[in-house]
Amino acid sequence: MYFGDNMSMARIVCVVLMAATLAIPDWVDAQPEPSADAPRTAWGTPSFEGTWQLATMTPLERPEGYEDRPTITGADAEAFLKQLQTAFRQGLDAALSADVEFGDGGATESIVDDPLLDERTSLVVSPSTGRIPFTPIGRERRSLPSRRMQEVPDGPEDRAMDERCMMGGSLPLRRSPFPAVFFQTPDHLVIHHEFVNGTIIIPIDDRPQIPSTIQQWTGASRGSWDGDTLVIESSNFDPRATFQGSGAALRLVQRLTRIDHDTLHYAFTVYDEVSFTAPWSVEFPLTNTEEPTYEFACHEGNRSMPLLLSGARATEEKAEFVGAFNLESFERMDDGDGSAPTVTDGMLSY
């Protein structure tokens, strides 16, 4: 079951947000200034071209008990990092050993070796608690994908977009073992994620936004310059491409500032009055890796999806068989030689 919006309310909220003048968050004033030798394009604007990545163990939200500690130092920082590493490994082990279709082949294991970001306890900088201000609807939306992972899928539509090899990288940028490649022209910025080949094309000109009735998986973005900072406003997101519980009312404002050769300052603010009680903001530096990117061959032709769905049908058949004979499990069905029914190619056998 898909947790949908009240579309009439969502449209009203979208119109209000589009018409409103968005206040600039207080943290914008504290952004670092570009160095004198920060790279620029041949046409004079700051250059964002390169391969960029955020590699850190600092969590998006501040853990409970740290709401009044935006930064942490010394032995406390070491203990905090070890706590994050332990929780990450335990969560990954639990997911890979659970009776659900989940796994990344250990690709995210490398994240645990990353340090804290400037001794911060969260990437969220506003609200000051470092936590996302959910409404009940937003909290329900955010929990839906993880709950659906526990369910037997009826079809591919019940699985995540990246599992279906349809969409991987999207906005906003976030910490990831997979970098993003930026390409730039005088009137466009292109952000390419090799992870499931997500490519976002951002016009930098005066063209109007597309009609609000048109929704896209990665939204529709428009860029404009605020001094040496590129401001990207994105809306028209398909509500199924939710970010932290967002819906059709999502409006995203991102700010990119090239600080020096190795650093691109990135910040974004999330607006969605249906999912959040107030706007919330994140900021962090992206690092120029200067490393080559390699093809992300999604499931090498997505062979995993038919196997996953056939396994789901076998699970259903097993449950129906057990229920029909009022058995607790197949192991109770024993003819004396220790054999029990099994499932092969979706058929019951002994």
Language-model regions: role of each:
Residues 2-3, 26-350:
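PEST-like low-complexity, intrinsically disordered acidic/proline/serine-rich tracts
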Residues 1-10:
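N-terminal secretory signal peptides that target proteins for export/translocation
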Residues 13-23:
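Bacterial N-terminal signal peptides
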